């Protein structure tokens, strides 16, 4: 793009061309998602695991621990750039859980480690109990400060992306059976809760925007949790209408997106759970496509598409204003996919969404929680090399 008449500059997180007189021309070159992309979380390096263990034993101070985290994030970003990726993240290194830590940053939310969790396929995912102790409101969010640290590493070839749980994920957290009694002390109806969650998210989104964030990703397991026969049986046993649930998930997400700045890209990653290489649910997207694919007001969808995800036919419901990132490379196993088989799947998906609106990524993050998935760091990088290699062959 650059030549003797123009030079590249980074303005508010967007790559631009500027001439010698200072006139600026906007470019979409650094608008996520990219042809080869990734979800966001990475395996915690051993130095970080050791530091966390020392912190828990009071062998190092919180200040010393934070310095180590900063160093490891800087190393991760350097690796992301070395691999040729245009998006940088902090790997979620500052979190214990991909979703709960963000919720703890709202007023009215408390958490406690009671040794409980959520049953995944063959394994209990140990999670902190997270519940309401008052009305949910926004306050200066610590994740915004984490983003500011990441943003300093942006350059003319990269843009910082930050991942947070979707509003629907926060809504779902406070209406699960174990939390409903405490939630009803502050919210008589789900609609009241939806209203406050959407307001809080809009405020936090503004905080991110004011800090220079132009690429924000909602991570959303709620849609994956309401697909398949098991979900139908689960909600029927609870006496809850599944279509009402889907409508409320869509409502809270779209309310939170109202009024977002035009130059802020917000995407949504949808999967079915990711903990120590296990999963929470299985099922095709068909039963939620009319909601999230057709009517959720995000710029792009990063969709898990492994063997538990059904066919590509549901992609026909994706609205024409959205891009789709196909999550065809698993992060749950170190085995590398066959390149030609992945290319064939991309070709199959292009029957429903034009190739120019498709991208490629791993199906989920590499470490949605501190424990991480069952592969090594080098196997993690090999997955990303494969994604890039395939994308360059398909799209040039």
Locate each region found by the language model.
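Domain-level signal for soluble alpha/beta catalytic cores
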Residues: 22-396
């Amino acid at each position: 793009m650059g030549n003797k008449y123009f030079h590249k500059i980074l303005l508010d997180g967007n790559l631009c061309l500027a001439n010698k007189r200072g006139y600026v021309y906007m470019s979409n070159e650094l608008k996520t998602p990219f042809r080869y992309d990734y979800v966001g979380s990475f395996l915690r390096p051993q130095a970080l695991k050791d530091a966390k263990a020392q912190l828990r034993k009071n062998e190092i101070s919180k200040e010393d621990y934070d310095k180590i985290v900063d160093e490891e994030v800087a190393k991760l970003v350097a690796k992301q750039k070395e691999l040729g990726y245009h998006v940088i993240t902090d790997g979620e290194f500052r979190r214990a859980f991909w979703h709960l830590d963000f919720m703890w940053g709202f007023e009215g939310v408390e958490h406690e480690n009671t040794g409980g969790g959520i049953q995944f396929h063959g394994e209990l995912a140990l999670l902190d109990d997270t519940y309401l102790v008052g009305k949910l409101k926004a306050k200066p969010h610590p994740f915004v400060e984490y983003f500011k640290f990441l943003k300093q590493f942006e350059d003319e070839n990269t843009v910082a992306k930050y991942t947070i749980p979707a509003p629907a994920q926060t809504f779902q957290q406070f209406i699960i059976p174990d939390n409903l009694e405490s939630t009803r002390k502050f919210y008589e109806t789900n609609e009241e809760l939806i209203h406050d969650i959407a307001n809080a998210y809009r405020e936090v989104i503004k905080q991110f925007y004011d800090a220079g964030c132009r690429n924000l990703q909602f991570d959303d397991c709620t849609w994956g949790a309401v697909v398949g026969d098991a979900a139908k049986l689960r909600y029927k046993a609870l006496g809850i209408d599944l279509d009402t649930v889907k409508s409320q998930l869509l409502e809270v997400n779209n309310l939170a997106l109202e009024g977002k700045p035009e130059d802020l890209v917000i995407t949504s990653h949808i999967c079915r759970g990711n903990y120590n290489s296990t999963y929470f649910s299985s099922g095709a997207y068909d039963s939620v496509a009319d909601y999230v694919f057709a009517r959720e007001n995000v710029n792009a969808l990063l969709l898990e598409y492994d063997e538990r995800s059904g066919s590509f036919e549901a992609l026909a419901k994706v609205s024409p204003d959205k891009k789709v990132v196909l999550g065809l490379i698993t992060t749950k196993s170190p085995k590398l996919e066959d390149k030609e088989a992945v290319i064939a799947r991309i070709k199959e998906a292009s029957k429903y969404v034009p190739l120019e609106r498709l991208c490629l990524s791993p199906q989920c993050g590499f470490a949605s929680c501190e424990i991480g998935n069952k592969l090594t760091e080098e196997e993690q990088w090999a997955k990303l090399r494969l994604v890039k290699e395939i994308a360059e062959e398909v799209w040039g």
